[in-house]
């Protein structure tokens, strides 16, 4: 049963960024096993086909995915390697970045079993400080990552830097922790999340109660917890040099089961597509 939570209205003062980043990495290092289990579940059910269709159709909308072969794709916050499996199977050359060394290890193992490891290169580093030259990637993707950014404008600016002119950015995320700062959303969530069995996930995929509390504490210190998205993203991306910014607020209907859509009814998954402008702004 979902627990009640007393919402706060304003973010606390920013803490030391380096210390906070270490806390985030430590959290995901400790979550890597259960998070990898959830990815393994997705590989074996309807999620894999749904995500493959949704992701590849956005990368190559007019080519029946044939043109994805050879594309240089950067996955930001790769976690246990779900996108790496999809993308490497389609022939993309994938660079996978995550700040958690344990997540990278899980991803390596999962890609070795289910993907094409010859096409995947892993980098353990911060997604806002990338070890790549400018304008080198055809596509950048991220799933369930942007909400975690202490400085989301810095993150988007860095991702824009490494994209080729005309390259595409695909962001999949949700207002995961809006219930912490909105009492009305929290009350709706409590009803939606009364029974987790509707998710039909394996027991090994769930975070522990302690991990959930720790993640909530981190979320309260992150700026995007206090924004309404994807409206916020749509408002800032053009100023960073992105064109053709589009958001799909019903994206979860394409990749989630009915149970997941019900359980996470207050935080549906959205998709953002944006293109790096081909000409430099004056």
Segments predicted by a language model, with ranges:
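Conserved class I S-adenosyl-L-methionine
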Residues: 2-68, 82-86, 168-209, 251
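Class I SAM-dependent methyltransferase SAM/SAH-binding core
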Residues: 72-76, 80-129
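A short acidic, Gly/Pro-enriched loop at the edge of an enzyme's catalytic core
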Residues: 128-139
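A short SAM/SAH-binding and catalytic strip from SAM-dependent methyltransferases
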Residues: 139-151
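A short glycine-rich, Lys/Arg-flanked "PGG" loop and its adjoining helix->strand segment in the class I
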Residues: 153-165
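Short alpha-helix
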Residues: 224-241, 247
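Core SAM-dependent methyltransferase catalytic element
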Residues: 257-282
